[in-house]
Amino acid sequence: MKKIRQIKSYPVIPRSAEDPANQKGNLKRAQVELKKRFERINKAMKQLVKDQEQYQRVASANKMAFWWPLDSNGERINEVVVNKAYYSYDISTERYDSINSFIEHLLYNELLESLTGQRPNNWFYQSYLSSAYNDAIRDTIQSSKNMAEPSVVGDEIAMMIRQLDADAFNPQQVNALSLVYSRVFNEMKGLTDSMKVDLSETLTRGMASGLGIREITQDVAKRVGVGFSRAQRISRTEILGAYRTAQRDKTRQINEDIYSDSPFVQKQLWFSALAMTSRPHHVAKHGQIYSMQEVEEFYSENGNSINCLCSQSPILVNRKTGEAVMKDLIKKMRQQKDAWRAGVGR
């Protein structure tokens, strides 16, 4: 698939068609950190289950279970006798509360870094969100500078755009990023509370059912794995969500502060993630131009934001006609999309 070459008057062109927001490295670092934390959770839960061995005793009479495998006609093949050991556990209300307390402390410490459930100032996940957010601010400013040619937008606007600084302190951006932190922390807290109930029920139900330590350990490990999958999904969704949110916020600010009385306005050029895992209706948007409201509505519906690797970039358009100033870029992107579809048969 042919890549689109970066040209001075174009917005920032993705280096990888599969990773248009250039967040692959950031995502990987976040995934590695989450994996380490869930490995510690799994190890601690395994030890918690093993600790229940001291409260375990084999039932006085093992239960005998008889079953007969049948063929496709319902006829018995032969008799199989299964002799399975059942256990009973001495578990008091205090012991039950102790198990719940241990699980809550473990999960809150590893995933929230807070025993109160309140977001700490230096929550570990903030670094990945801030990295994505700040990348988007820089990309948006650079795209705006690339497109603001004096011969097109005029000397005054071109000069104002050139003065934009991604590193300048901006209280609006600080507040917006804080809101991103809070939203994602609440999502992770929801996952943590759900896991707390799930792991506690899996452990205590296994004990009540008379299962052995090995079986309970396996069941608990499966539930930890489910939690890890959910955490990964939150990670992918929210890091890219932070990038897209920052890009829209900065584009909107530039429109209001600089382009408000201009015959031009910056809209949203859609860069789809041209990857096998991308949903067809996401790929279809590659090279299309949308308003920021249209983009926000799309991501608010039908789980479209979940695991989405697409990104958008500001694109300079004529306010009256809605046509892009860089028509050749739009043409190249649509050709790129058609070539990718032909190559993968979609």
Map each language-model feature to its residues:
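Acidic, glycine-rich two-metal-ion catalytic cores of nucleic acid-processing enzymes
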Residues: 225-226, 230-331
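N-terminal leader/targeting and assembly helices and adjacent pre-domain segments
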Residues: 1-223, 319-346
